């Protein structure tokens, strides 16, 4: 299969590598869409890549191609979105259900090969099925959308409040949209990019302020 392989700092190559075979409890996903996260940038041009060669990419959607032994909830042809965090399920935090605090976690597209490739093998629980009414492009946004929702819920947000979002990148704009969905009185996005603020307006965010140009 073809993949974008990081061989060293500032050295990423589009080349042929072996197509993974799903192990027990895994599914093989044919990637349809994948996003480039801000965290992928230092993994290529910084010192954040865990090993070389590596295949990045953790925001993705696709179709189940084949399933490994023991897989029961998914079948070939299912449309799925990827969940990159792979907790060990054995440490104290995992046993309490605090998977994001796992001491021995893996992460698709960082600590193991990810979705900058034609295919990616993931645990069954890390492939979330979605309906035909959801496009593959939308499905690839599942992961950043949930990151934004988690952040908003951690603030103790209540509907009817005014909400300020500092930064109108992907996560910021998702946060603003979630706030609107849950009944925010008014949502304001602060950024230094007019392009991002125009997108915020297109997404029906109440107000956008360029902090380089406006005194607030």
Name these PLM-found stretches.
Residues 73, 213-216:
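Short, intrinsically disordered, charge-balanced linker/junction segments flanking boundaries
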Residues 135-213:
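Mid-domain Rossmann-like dinucleotide-binding core that forms the NAD(H)/NADP(H) cofactor-binding site
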Residues 39-43:
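Cytochrome P450 core scaffold surrounding the K-helix E-X-X-R motif
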Residues 2, 26-28, 162:
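Residues that mark the start of a beta-strand
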Residues 20-34, 47-92, 131-134:
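Glycine-rich beta-strand-centered segment in the early N-terminal region that forms part
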Residues 88-166:
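NAD(P)H dinucleotide-binding glycine-rich loop of Rossmann-like/cofactor-binding domains
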Residues 7, 18-19, 51-57, 108-112:
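Short Gly/Pro-enriched turn/cap motifs at secondary-structure boundaries
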